[in-house]
C-alpha cells in the first residue's frame, strides 16, 4: 500500500508507464494504491525479456557444432593417422566417455529451456507449440542413442576389453569399420539438436508461430 500523495512526479510518471503490465489498478478512498495482477503473467513477461528461447537456440547450436566437429575433423584424422587397431579403439573410447558426460546433459538443459519458453508463451496466451516441438526434437537424440547406436557401442567396448585382456584382437580394417559406422550414426544424431535449433530460430524470428 502506498499513498499517491507521497509520490514524486517522476514516480507518478513511472506508475502511469506501468499500466500495460499491471492491468488492475484501484484507487481507494483513503488515497492508497492497490495493485492486483496475476503473478504468473508478470513473471512470464519478465522471463520473455530475458530471452529463454534465445539461450536454448544457442545451447542447441553449440551441441550440434560439437557433435559435427567429430565427423568433420576428429574421426577422419584418427582413422587416417592410426595404424594400430587397439589404439584406434582406445581413442574412440576416450571420445565416447567425454561426450557421454557432456552431451546428454546439454541436450536435456536445452530441452528444458525450450519447455520453459513454451510454458511462458502459453501463460500469456501466445503461440507456444513450436517451442515444445523444438525441445522434444532436441531431447530425441537421447532415445536415438539407445535404440540405434547401442549395438555399435557395445561392439567397440567389447573390442577394447579384448585388447586389454590380451584376447582375440579385431583387425585394423574391422576397427575402422566400427568407428566409421559410429561416426555416421553420431552425425545423424547431431541432426536432432540442429533441427531443434532451426525450429527455435524460426520461432525467434517470428517465421513459425503456432
Swiss-Prot record:
Matches recorded under InterPro entries: Anthrone_oxy
UniProt keyword annotations, A-Z: Membrane, Monooxygenase, Oxidoreductase, Transmembrane, Transmembrane helix
Disruption phenotype: Cells accumulate excess amounts of norsolorinic acid (NA) and a small amount of norsolorinic acid anthrone (NAA).
Subcellular localization: Membrane
Any single Pfam family the record assigns to this protein: Anthrone_oxy
One of the protein's GO biological processes: aflatoxin biosynthetic process
Ranges that cross the membrane: 59-79, 105-125, 131-151, 188-208
Reactions performed catalytically: noranthrone + O2 = norsolorinic acid + H2O
GO terms, molecular function: monooxygenase activity
Function comment: Monooxygenase that converts norsolorinic acid anthrone to norsolorinic acid during aflatoxin biosynthesis.
Family the entry assigns: Belongs to the anthrone oxygenase family.
Protein name per Swiss-Prot or TrEMBL: Noranthrone monooxygenase
Organism: Aspergillus flavus (strain ATCC 200026 / FGSC A1120 / IAM 13836 / NRRL 3357 / JCM 12722 / SRRC 167)
